């Protein structure tokens, strides 16, 4: 599996240092709310720079056509695009209208990127920085060498590591709930190694396509590490990631991370897995997850009980756990979505010790 280099840590340090410009306006634990989305936007800006003129020309030709989204993606050679005349560098030419121009620039991104920014709730930060007179200053930092995130400078894999490091620092600054969306990389690597250990089809086959699902994907660490590890073993294999996340910000981070690395983010969905399953009726080759433990499911009670009436026609045919045991519902979700073993299905769930004890007790009852 690929390892990090000093270059990655240095770049992450440089990007995080931009937060110095936020001092006084934001508290230290709020820096990530600005740095994360801005880093995503800047990376997209750099990625699209090489095809910017081609996209603008194509937009003039197809802006009134119903198929324009497909044509613009083709012009950008990416899964996203921007039809604004602005780039970060061009925004610097007009400091007096930075807020207006920056908003216009963001609004011209494709819908998948706008969805990420909406989930980041970034619009309010634009207003705050503009009102406090630091918006231009902060954006300008991203046009210096420290903010150079062009693919010629930083590969997709390196950018993924840099983004991961910024996420880690952000999680530490929110240490009261960091565990909800950050699973240590070494834990994920161990799980992934076990998951693929004896799967000869995916390890040695040519042009094999498999699916992987995480019902509580958080920032997408498990899905990303699984893809990265598999490609290091067999570059011809395609692993399509499916995930759902309830928290808006962690969903935005996950979807952004997928796009940053050049992966397909279409199947990363937001919403409550227990009450609003975005992949109802679907099954997957692999399931890898670290669902939240100690979480009550009383808020989802009505929807869960309604689905339980379907028996094994739904996810909860084995019966419902105690109201305090939401993790068991995630476990049943994973089991219901696993392909049969004879069709290659495999799963791995990271659970708390208390959950295993609870399972033992339930087996005695059942």
Region roles according to the model:
Residues 19-20, 148, 172-178, 212, ...:
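Glycine- and acidic
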């Amino acid at each position: 599996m690929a390892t990090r280099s000093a270059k990655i840590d240095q770049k992450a340090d440089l990007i995080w240092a931009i937060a110095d410009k936020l001092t006084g306006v934001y508290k230290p634990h709020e820096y990530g709310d600005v740095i994360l989305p801005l880093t995503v936007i800047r990376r997209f800006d750099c990625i699209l720079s090489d095809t910017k003129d081609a996209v603008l020309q194509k937009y003039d030709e197809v802006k009134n056509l119903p198929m324009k989204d497909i044509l613009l993606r083709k012009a950008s050679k990416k899964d996203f695009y921007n039809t604004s005349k602005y780039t970060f560098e061009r925004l610097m030419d007009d400091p007096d209208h930075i807020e207006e121009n920056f908003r216009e620039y963001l609004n011209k991104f494709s819908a998948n990127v706008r969805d990420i920014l909406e989930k980041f709730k970034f619009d309010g930060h634009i207003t705050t920085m503009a009102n406090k007179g630091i918006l231009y200053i902060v954006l300008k930092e991203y046009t210096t060498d420290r903010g150079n995130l062009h693919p010629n400078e930083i590969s997709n894999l390196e950018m993924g590591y840099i983004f991961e490091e910024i996420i880690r620092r952000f999680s530490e600054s929110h240490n009261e709930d960091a565990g909800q969306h950050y699973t240590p990389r070494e834990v994920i690597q161990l799980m992934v190694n076990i998951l693929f250990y004896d799967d000869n089809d995916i390890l040695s086959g040519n042009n094999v396509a498999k699916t992987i699902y995480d019902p509580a994907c958080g920032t997408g660490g498990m899905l990303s590490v699984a893809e990265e590890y598999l490609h290091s073993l067999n570059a011809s294999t395609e692993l399509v990631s499916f995930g759902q996340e309830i928290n808006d910000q962690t969903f935005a981070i996950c979807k952004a991370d997928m796009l940053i690395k050049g992966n397909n983010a279409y199947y990363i969905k937001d919403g409550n897995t227990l009450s609003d399953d975005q992949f109802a009726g679907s099954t997957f080759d692999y399931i890898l997850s670290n669902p939240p433990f100690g979480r009550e499911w009383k808020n989802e009670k009505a929807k869960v009980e309604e689905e339980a009436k379907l028996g094994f026609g739904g996810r909860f045919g084995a019966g419902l756990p105690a109201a305090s045991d939401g993790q068991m519902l995630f476990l049943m979700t994973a089991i219901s979505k696993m392909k049969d073993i004879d069709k290659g299905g495999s799963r791995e769930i990271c659970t708390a010790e208390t959950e295993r004890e609870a399972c033992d007790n339930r087996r005695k009852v059942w």
